[in-house]
Regions:
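Hydrophobic alpha-helical transmembrane segments
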Residues: 37-49
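Conserved beta-hairpin
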Residues: 48-85, 90
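Charged phosphate-binding loop/patch that engages nucleotide di/tri-phosphates or the phosphate backbone
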Residues: 136-150
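A short, polar/proline- and glycine-enriched secondary-structure boundary/capping micro-motif
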Residues: 17, 84-85, 134-138
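Short, intrinsically disordered/low-complexity patches at protein termini
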Residues: 29-30, 40, 96-97, 105-108, ...
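N-terminal membrane-targeting/pre-transmembrane regions
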Residues: 1-36, 105, 110-120, 133
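Non-transmembrane, membrane-adjacent beta-strand/coil modules in membrane-associated proteins
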Residues: 74-132
Length: 150
C-alpha cells in the first residue's frame, strides 16, 4: 500500500502566468476586432480562447507528491502522472538541453529538477523547495531499495 511521504507545490513566477495567458489574450483581442465583420467568427474565436485556456489549466501541475514507491505529479481534476521508483535512475539539476517531459512552472532553472528514467523520457519539474524535495526523495528511494532487497 502506498503512503505519502512528502508533498510540494510548483514554484511559479509571473512570467509563466503571462506566457500561459498570452495565446488566449491574443485570440480575444482579435475576436474583439472582428465582431463587427462576422459574429460567427468572433464566437468561434471566443470558444477557441476558452478551450485553449482550459487545456493549459489542465496541463500545469498543481502538486508534486513523493510516496513510498513512486513520485506522483498531480494536475487539476482526476489527472495525475506516476513515476515508479523502478524506472528512476537519478534525480538532480537538469542538463542544459533535455528531451523529455517538461512541466516547468517558472522561467528560472534554479528550482528545476530532472528525473532521469530507465528506457523512458526524463521528466523536468519545478518544486517550490528543491532541496527538501530531493532529500525526501533520496530518503524514500533508499527505504524503497532496502524493502525491495528483503
Amino acid at each position: 500500500m502506498d503512503y505519502k511521504i512528502y508533498e510540494d507545490i510548483p514554484h511559479t513566477d509571473i512570467w509563466i502566468r503571462g506566457i500561459v495567458l498570452l495565446p488566449a489574450a491574443i485570440i480575444l483581442v482579435t475576436a474583439i476586432f472582428t465582431w463587427q465583420e462576422s459574429l460567427e467568427v468572433t464566437l468561434y474565436m471566443i470558444g477557441l480562447a476558452f478551450l485553449s485556456s482550459l487545456v493549459i489549466v489542465f496541463i500545469i501541475p498543481i502538486k508534486y507528491c513523493i510516496y513510498n514507491t513512486k513520485i506522483r505529479i498531480e494536475f487539476r481534476g482526476p489527472f495525475a502522472f506516476n513515476i515508479p521508483f523502478e524506472t528512476v535512475t537519478s534525480i538532480g539539476d537538469p542538463r542544459w538541453f533535455t528531451v523529455g517531459i517538461n512541466l516547468p512552472t517558472n522561467m528560472s532553472q534554479s528550482s528545476a529538477i530532472e528525473i532521469a528514467r530507465k528506457g523512458r523520457m526524463s521528466v523536468n519539474i519545478t518544486p517550490s523547495d528543491k532541496k527538501a524535495f530531493i532529500s525526501n526523495f533520496e530518503k524514500a528511494f533508499q527505504d524503497w531499495k532496502k524493502g525491495k532487497d528483503i
